[in-house]
Amino acid sequence: MVDIVERYLDAIATHDWGVVDDCIADDIVRVGPYGDRYAGRGDYMAFIADLMPKLPGYAMKVERVTYVGDARAYAELSETVELDGKPMRTPEVLVFELADDGRIARVDVFIQTPQG
């Protein structure tokens, strides 16, 4: 599935949990920018479905997705949420490892923090 990462990101942005579930492997591992880790379909789906609706003003803008062979992809994007009534934009890179069946087996999230 060449467009698996794009489908996954669109489903995250639109809170389409059925599509997210279709895109991920049973043994998915997600490692967040602060070392937080969720392993397995159940834990990951519970985390993401609980978190996303709580983010006020959430928006995702995908700049590009780059596939490296059949096993890895990189997504450059930004996520925006409202903080104290003002939009806060966070640039990110997500690194995806893809399983043999094309589903997402691992997601590593890296964020760009402001200097200071």
Q: Across the structure, where does each feature detected by a protein language model lie?
A:
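A beta-strand edge to alpha-helix "cap/lid" segment located at domain peripheries
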Residues: 13, 31, 45-116
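Amphipathic alpha-helical repeat scaffolds
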Residues: 6-10
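Short, well-ordered alpha-helical segments enriched in acidic and aromatic residues
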Residues: 14-31
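Short beta-edge strand/loop motif at the mouth of beta-sheet-based domains
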Residues: 37-46
